[in-house]
Structures are given as structure tokens and as C-alpha cells.
A protein has these predicted regions:
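Short cationic amphipathic helices and targeting signals
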Residues: 1-5
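Active-site and adjacent loop segments of nucleotide-processing enzymes
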Residues: 7-26, 31-204
Length: 204
């Protein structure tokens, strides 16, 4: 990602390919963007929160990714440990971020205990991102809501609508033939139908 003055854009684009080729790189230049929230880096976008700019992983895809466990969850106790661990990691990553903050707090409410320093969890990208961060309560500001809207297309009204449902959500779990299954659906407004969240937690 290059962040430059708009006045320098033409000059940079004129010489960028040549400079990168001399450095041994071959790459594709995407169209320029003119706001921080439109930057995409490692499948994440910047969102301005009360604690500064936070790189927020691709939403709502991140909800599906964080609903998958690489650890065997054979009992309700295991599920609760997993839910608590994922939730606390997510809270550290998204404190002050609309929607996602409520999502991870729902996991913590549903969970209990911890797997601790497990080789799988300690080597994940989310674990590295959350390293050194704390999960203290952070207010979601109007500025954060507008910034999240710019980044992911969810208006403050819809953010609050989904958060109201998430804030009252506690996950239930059942052990089926394929392992622990969790079904949930959120009511997503028609305008955001392409982002409809309908997921299923599976552990094999």
C-alpha cells in the first residue's frame, strides 16, 4: 500500500512499474482510492475507532472464518472453552468496532474456561494480530460507525439493528453425528441482502 499526496499520483503511477521491476518485483496496480476506509491490505480495512485506526478483517466473511475450529470439540466443555478463547481474541481485535465487537462478546457470554497456549491457536494470524492488545470495554463512537459504513457499506442504523440482536444472543450447542453444531441467523435489512449472515458452526 502506498499512501501519497493526490498531486503526486500521476508521477508515481508513471514510474512505479519501472521502479518495482528494478527491485525484482512483478505486480498489478489496483485503482487508487481516496479515503482510508477504502484501503485493502491483507483482507482487512482501516476503521477509525476511539482508540485510533484499527485494521478490521474482511466483514462479514470473518464471522464465517471465526466459526470454524481446528481443535476437536467433542464435548460441551470443549465448545465453551473454544467460544471463550475465540471471543476474547476477537474482543481484543475489535474493541470499539461496530457489529464485530458485539459478535465476539456474544461468544464470550456463551463460553467458559480456556484451552490455554495450544500450538494451533498460538500460530494463527488472529493470535498474532491480538498479541499485546487488551479487551477492555471501549465505547463505539459515532465516528467509528461512519468509518465502518465507509469501509463495509453498513449504515449506522443497520449496525445498531444487528447489534441489538447480538447483544441479546447466547449460543446454544448440540452434539450431533458431525460434531457440535450451532445454527444462527441474523435479521439483515433488504439493502444488505448480499451480506446476509447465515452460518453454521461445524467441528469435525
Amino acid at each position: 500500500v502506498l499512501i501519497i499526496e493526490k498531486a503526486d499520483l500521476e508521477l508515481v503511477l508513471k514510474h512505479l512499474h519501472e521502479w518495482m521491476k528494478l527491485s525484482g518485483y512483478w505486480f498489478v496496480v489496483e485503482d487508487p482510492v481516496y479515503s482510508m476506509e477504502k484501503i485493502i491490505f491483507c483482507q482487512a480495512k482501516p476503521v477509525k475507532t476511539s482508540r485510533g485506526w484499527v485494521m478490521v478483517r474482511d466483514f462479514p466473511l470473518t464471522l464465517a472464518k471465526d466459526s470454524i475450529s481446528l481443535l476437536p470439540l467433542k464435548t460441551e466443555v470443549h465448545w465453551k472453552k473454544w467460544a471463550n478463547d475465540v471471543g476474547r481474541c476477537g474482543i481484543a481485535l475489535t474493541a470499539g468496532v461496530p457489529v464485530l465487537y458485539s459478535w465476539y462478546k456474544a461468544l464470550v457470554r456463551s463460553g467458559d474456561g480456556s484451552f490455554g497456549a495450544h500450538p494451533w491457536s498460538s500460530r494463527t494470524g488472529a493470535s498474532y494480530l491480538a498479541s499485546g492488545l487488551s479487551g477492555e470495554e471501549v465505547a463505539i463512537t459515532d465516528e467509528a460507525r461512519v468509518s465502518f459504513w465507509e469501509a463495509f457499506g453498513w449504515s449506522p442504523y443497520y449496525q445498531r439493528l444487528v447489534e441489538a440482536e447480538l447483544n441479546g444472543l447466547t449460543h446454544d450447542f448440540s452434539l450431533g453425528r458431525e460434531g457440535i453444531q450451532q445454527h444462527y441467523n441474523l435479521i439483515i435489512p433488504k439493502e444488505n441482502a448480499k451480506h446476509f449472515i447465515s452460518n453454521q458452526l461445524y467441528n469435525y
